[in-house]
Amino acid sequence: MGNPVDNKFTWVIKNFCSVSPKPIYSDQFLIGGNKWHILAYSKKRDGHQFLCLDLELVDCEFLPSEWRKVVKVSFTVVNFFSKKLSRQIGLKHCFNKKERSKGGSLFHLSELTDKKSGFLVDGEVEIVAQITVLETDRRFHVSKDYNMEMQCWDGMATTLVENKELNDDDKAGLVNVKGFQVLPSQLGIVNRIFEKHPETALECCTKNQELRASYINVIFSLIKLLYKGAQEHSTHDLSDAEGALAYMKNLGFKLDWLEKKLDEVKEIKKKCERVTEMEKELHDLMNKHTNVSKLLEKEKLEIKNASAPDLSFSDVI
């Protein structure tokens, strides 16, 4: 369904088994003053089938020939285990009568259809599109600057963390560590991970370097999350961490050391919660003690007053 307030459209594909090169279409939706729909299809690349998503302008034949609209769109394939594992791709494109659709590929279809991955649950796949109109100008002419600008996100944050495409200088500076291409800034922590836990990625069969880089980022995020102060962990954070660990284990990663840390953090969190409860109980008891003490003093005073000699009665006797 479409939401014109936040410019989002959610597409739930039911009875999803796989997609073919022939696209399937979402319902039409209205955002930014125009009707759109989403196309999902498969595309073969490097011997693998990838899921591709396109945003397509509907009824553009009725628009003026000089019509242009620059649009930024992001597609998110929702992970039902944890939002942090959701996959997102973003692009910017100048739509016109001739260029009515644009999109990109997200990840291997085999990973999408793997029931252990968290993307396919009860035969359903959920896709969220967010569309922002950046410019509308009939005098605007298409240029290379407004061809597609691809930006990929790795999904490791409650709000997805942007992972910008590497430029040539970045790629030239990449360092290979145990088959993972990492930036020099990541080298220290990656080396420490594999030195202390050499079994971590021995059974990871994925050869695609982009996917391997995203998996390393998942591990980074888990470390950052689990090594925070005990009081900084929310129940939601720990649930996400548990889902992320289960996902990584299904991919072949040996992360017993992180699972152990997660168990420790969960135990500490339970103790923190117990301490909070005990402090509240103590506070309530102290308040009750104060109230009872005041009531006791009042009762004693009333008894004392009631027991005092009645002079008028004594005079009579």
UniProtKB/Swiss-Prot annotation:
It comes from the Eukaryota. Keywords: Coiled coil. This is MATH domain and coiled-coil domain-containing protein At3g58240. InterPro entries: MATH-CC_domain_protein, MATH/TRAF_dom, TRAF-like. Residues 6-131 form the MATH domain. The lineage of its organism: Eukaryota, Viridiplantae, Streptophyta, Embryophyta, Tracheophyta. PANTHER family: TRAF-LIKE SUPERFAMILY PROTEIN, UBIQUITIN-SPECIFIC PROTEASE FAMILY C19-RELATED PROTEIN. It comes from Arabidopsis thaliana (Mouse-ear cress). It holds the Pfam family MATH_2. The keyword Coiled coil applies. The keyword Coiled coil applies. Residues 254-305 form a coiled coil. Transmembrane segments: none annotated.
